[in-house]
């Protein structure tokens, strides 16, 4: 991860920090903070979640630099099918949430959230299944193997699942679960948070690889990993702003094959974004570069103390880019 022409003073000089209000609580937060960098090639987004320490967050900074200073890959397709995203909400809220994803034929439903029960997960999934033909669920590693096996039975009692995303935390658990159930398994955290992102595939622990641009270090880094994977790839958002979504669409548009809907419709989870949200047409988005609206940047600007927090974070992450590259 070599930043190339992006010096630290240059990055900080080009920095904008925004706080995006969310419609519903997601990943335990109601406001999403991200740092945006305007470079010679466009805008990049640094939005590593607040609890991530510099060694993990550095890849997210590399992704922002890649977008702001690098060149995008060639486009292979002009239409990216997307899935709707349904947080851990009561079933009554499901129709309103799905209405923000016009034409989407696939929905990803959050399950295994703290404080939730399997029964409430089943109710939520069935409410989604009544409105969308293809349903996948995401447990974010929240189950043990036995719990995941039980959940697979309960969640498929009234219809199939496209896949279980990260039902358990470790590669070993995923491999054991895959031997025990027939529902396909997708790996997310087991790829993006691993020292070796290919280990889960080599272990035969997943049927689908969920890849996210920012945690993997940028579009080109993601495409390099995807080229080494012999299972289908789904490109997904890391709760990105419109800038980060554009990077995800660029990656999805460059893949040689794209079999599944991508998780790149999460802009609908924000009350306000830095650019006008792209509206899906027949359940799909078109890849395009995005430039934030100056008025929105001003209106959504983070408080001075939060801006300084992100500056300090970039200063802590930046030296690690060279260290990861062996320089």
From Swiss-Prot:
The active site is at residues 110, 212. Pfam families: Enolase_like_N, MR_MLE_C. Mg(2+) binds at residues 138, 165, 188. Pathway: Quinol/quinone metabolism; 1,4-dihydroxy-2-naphthoate biosynthesis; 1,4-dihydroxy-2-naphthoate from chorismate: step 4/7; Quinol/quinone metabolism; menaquinone biosynthesis. One of its GO terms (biological process) is menaquinone biosynthetic process. Converts 2-succinyl-6-hydroxy-2,4-cyclohexadiene-1-carboxylate (SHCHC) to 2-succinylbenzoate (OSB). HAMAP family: MenC_1. NCBIfam families: PRK02901.1. This is o-succinylbenzoate synthase. The gene is menC.
């Amino acid at each position: 991860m070599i930043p190339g022409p992006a010096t630290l003073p240059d990055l900080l000089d080009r920095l904008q920090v925004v706080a995006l209000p969310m419609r519903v609580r997601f990943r335990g937060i109601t406001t999403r903070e991200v740092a945006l960098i305007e470079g010679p090639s466009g805008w990049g987004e640094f939005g590593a979640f607040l609890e991530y320490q510099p060694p993990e967050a550095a890849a997210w900074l590399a992704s922002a630099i890649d977008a702001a200073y690098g060149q995008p890959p060639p486009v292979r397709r002009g239409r990216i099918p997307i899935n709707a995203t349904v947080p851990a909400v009561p079933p009554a809220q499901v129709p309103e949430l799905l209405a923000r994803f016009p034409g989407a034929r696939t929905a990803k439903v959050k399950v295994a959230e703290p404080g939730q029960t399997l029964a409430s997960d089943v109710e939520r999934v069935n409410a989604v299944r009544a409105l969308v033909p293809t349903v996948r669920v995401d447990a974010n590693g929240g189950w043990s193997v036995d719990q995941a096996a039980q959940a697979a039975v309960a969640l498929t009692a009234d219809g199939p699942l496209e896949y279980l995303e990260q039902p358990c935390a470790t590669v070993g658990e995923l491999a054991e679960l895959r031997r025990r159930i027939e529902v396909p398994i997708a790996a997310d955290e087991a790829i993006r948070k691993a020292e070796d992102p290919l280990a889960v595939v080599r272990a035969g622990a997943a049927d689908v690889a969920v890849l996210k641009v920012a945690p993997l270090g940028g579009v080109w880094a993601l495409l390099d990993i995807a080229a080494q994977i012999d299972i289908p790839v789904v490109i997904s958002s890391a709760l990105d702003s419109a800038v980060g979504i554009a990077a995800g669409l660029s990656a999805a548009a460059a893949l040689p094959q794209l079999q599944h809907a991508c998780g790149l419709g999460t802009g609908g989870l924000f009350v306000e974004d830095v650019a006008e949200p792209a509206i899906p047409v027949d359940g799909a988005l078109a890849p395009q570069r995005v430039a934030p609206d100056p008025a929105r940047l001003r209106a959504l600007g983070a408080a001075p103390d939060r801006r300084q927090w992100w500056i300090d974070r970039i200063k802590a992450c930046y030296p690690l880019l060279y260290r990861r590259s062996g320089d």
